[in-house]
Amino acid sequence: MVTGETLVDSQKSLINNDTLLNEKLKEDFEENVSIDVKIHEELRRALPDYEESGFQRFTWHIKSWHELDRRAVSPQFAVGSRQFKITYFPQGTLQSAGFTSIFLEYIPSEEEKLSNKYGCCCQFAFVISNPRKPSLSVANSAHCRFSPEIVDWGFTQFAELKKLLCRQAPDVPPIVEDGALLLTAYVRILKDPTGVLWHSFNDYDSKIATGYVGLKNQGATCYMNSLLQSLYIIHAFRRIVYQIPTDSPQGKDSIAYALQRCFYNLQFMNEPVSTTELTKSFGWDSLDSFMQHDVQEFNRVLQDNLERSMRDTKVENALTNLFVGKMKSYIACVNVNFESARSEDYWDIQLNVKGMKNLEDSFRSYIQVETLEGDNCYFADTYGFQEAKKGVIFESFPPILHLQLKRFEYDFERDMMIKINDRYEFPLEFDAKAFLSPEADQSQNCEYVLYGVLVHSGDLHNGHYYALLKTEKDGPWYKYDDTRVTRATLREVLEENYGGDYIMHPPFRSPVKLKRFMSAYMLLYLRKDKLDELMNPVSADEIPEHLKEALNPSIQLAELRRKERLESHLYTKVQLITPEFYSEHHEFDIADFGNAYKEETIPQFRIKKEAKFSEFIPIVAEKLGYPQECMRFWYVVKRHNCTVRVESPVNELNSTMEEVKNVWNSQGEILRLYLEITPENELSSSLTHQNTGEWNAFIFVKYFDRKSQEISGCGTLHVNKSDEIRSICPLLCERANLPKNTPLNIYEEIKPGMVDFLRLEKTFTQSELSTGDIICFEPCRPSALEDDIVNSGFDSALKLYDFLSNKVLVLFRPRFIDQDSIIEFEMLLDRRIKYDDLCIELGQKLGIGADHIRLTTCNPLTYSAGMVVPNDSNITLYEILYSSEEEMPSNVIFYETMDVSLSDLDRKRLVRLRWLVDGLANIELVEAYINKSGDINDLFGAVCERFPDSDLRKKKVRVYEVFESRYHRDLSLRTLIRTINPAATLVGEVVPLDQLQLYPEEKIVQVHHFHKDIARIHGIPFSFVIKPQEKFIDTKLRLAARTQYPESIFSVIKFCVVDFDNNRVVYLNDEDITYDVVEKLNGTLALDRAKKDSKKPNILDRAIQMKN
């Protein structure tokens, strides 16, 4: 038995019935009220920033828990104007055995059901408690946006059954006592000022919701998208961009024209806008679009480029007037009348975040005066060294003020860039006059209003950028996150982007301190007295006509496609294979439905689902130019063997398009048909597409032309299945323009990899040919004119079919980009081709011998180079493509052209030696192919060839082996190459003079490199002489000479003695005796330094360039 009541009902019943108000009930009532207040407060504290539009507590009295069905539903209850009910699974759902499950279900109103677009934002808590002692309970909370997609929400594992049914202590009853429990729901309805609170965005349309559209992300261009949107919303900037002359042929290739097109599309399109054309105008390739860059740097490069486009035009200096202010750097002497000052323009201001509380602190720090005194005095002309004041002061502020917050800084302790996530506040409005020079024009307005916050979310190496922007003078805020634009609250603009820590208060749990990973890094302020000018909307009349003429058709086409997508559920899509299309088809089946590119070439129709098929016929006739009386339609279906063939004629003329589609394809979205064109007298008299009378089978015909080396569609035939196959030979010869009595080979195309030869004396029935089957014919013998073609191509349809079933399109890419070769190319190959033949074809393509090509497989997940393909003539192309352990193959193979043949390579080994030319500051890599039976002396010969002017043969040289940056052993010139571990690094040098003539007690040690932790060893170790009684200050001078590191690197190195075996480190002071510390520790010298000198340049670290 179950009953339910709301908070109001229960309180009224207790208060109005005086006879029940004994002391026990008073206590229960007070305890219940206390719990209700506490839970309501817990919920509000968890989401304090959302305004509540309704709250209700509903208690469901369950008196016989063990008798409940597997799924029980509570009475319906109201929260304000909204209706809810509870769905309870006492023994849990199928996925939550051992738990009890509870869900809150929203009941939409009739109006909401009709609109099918609604959202109800709720925060709720469930409490299961003991009816006699409500404090014995278990609770949990959640929040959800109820919508047509999500009608219920809750907990599959709300509580363990043993926690409900068992005593937690001998004197404590279970929560479910004698089968009774109270299941209480506390439901808060929250206002949704933005319309997207907890939205799934599955059916979200930015244009409809906000009036604005986003920008597509090309991979890592979110930083660019956020900046472009912040510039676009400033109407004055947009107006200037439109006024740049771009109507000349040269102008249409410019960045300015691409930006105009981008802005125009943002203004008038209803879908997210692509930036591909814009980045192409920058001269960027696909790699550039996957590189994260600094927004400030990108902004400056873009503005510089636009300024160049504005020279000698009516908008020259327009950007300067918008974005540029002036500041003065000065040094003023305290005791004499002397000042050195320089005024300069600025486009943005970089403000410190670390150690600052807010924007005002940063500005005060920026203009803080530094005193130059003592050893740091300023040298003034004619006055000598003087005490002085040094600083920066602003002389003017621009109408548009970009403030760059320095969220990314270099940490010298950790020797790396880090993100500063400290809390940093910025206001909606501020007055910059306090930071203006006293000598500047004090009448200028310096009040600014916040119009943009550009945000970085994440850490230094894995982040995302988006923007919060105010698009109108008195309008709301919007969040621009790539393709999506949504309304935003002031809290999202300010508090959520201050950074720092915040306290989360999950209901029924302890508070949790969390760190925000999103923080503002650029602020856009507009000067208050210029708002009307800056935000005056750009009208269509202000846009150049050539831009409208160029873009309006594409916008209209995009809108048409968008409308089609939105209305696609109302239409049936028809793919109609015509005789013309079939005659141009050169693959298996009657069309290639598995190839998206080729599928687009099939004639397409879009017809309302409710339309009759008889209404579809005249539409086809008009579009394709066929007479209706000669048209017969056939269903095209997928057979069990995965081929696509005609099945039967369409007889359902009075059925709807949806009904016709469902005859053979109830699950698919596309109706596929074949259109037969037949003379009127061959159609059935009723013209209602009845079955074809005495013609028992409708056969498709293909012809193999040896001259063109193609199989093509050659029409269709209605045949009597009792006729012999030879009966159609004259007609086939006529269609192929062959002599009437030409002997023919005829095959049945069953499926890829299965083509059968047909015996002409057999009937169609005996050959099991029926409607939709495909036959292919060819002359039995090639003609004299075809002999040369046959010798270099396919001499029969069977061989071409065999190739078609095994062909694969392979993309060949160079293994190393810097090779002087074709960047990449495609080849259509037989997957059974052997390795040697594959290399021959590649060699012909590349103009190089086949034995000078080495192939490498491709990882299908990362598209990076995998394993080198062994030089094995038995390996097939199929085995190379499927060589990865992943189930999916890759159609990419990497190649490299070799200086030596692969056969020589089998006898030789590529050996790499790092030659110390000038200490460790100049290391050259020497590579040589050495016979596997050779020795180090052969390798040394390659070094001498590399450095012919060094006269190395007359000098004492050393070659040594290094493993994982640790010295291993010296190698003599007679050391055999085959004895050297391929994983070792070989290092060579001319032996320093001080190591050739050691004094008594001097010794040579190996010096290693590490960074902070000796486990982080790196670099190339080197030999060094340590001397008795020598202080480290002198040792350091010799180390500088030995390494030849520049001062910028050597000055930051920390020197120490390391015992790697016992993990001990002793850092050296200038007065230490180096020799004694090494002997005492039984260790070696080491340099604690960052791994910079050996770091390869990262292509992702390169500066922004706009090459156009």
From Swiss-Prot:
Belongs to the peptidase C19 family. Hydrolase that deubiquitinates target proteins. Cleaves the UBL propeptide in sde2. It comes from Schizosaccharomyces pombe (strain 972 / ATCC 24843). PROSITE patterns: MATH, USP_1, USP_2, USP_3. The keyword Protease applies. Residues 55-187 form the MATH domain. This is Ubiquitin carboxyl-terminal hydrolase 5. It is found in: Nucleus. Its main location: nucleus. GO terms for biological process: protein deubiquitination; proteolysis; regulation of protein stability.
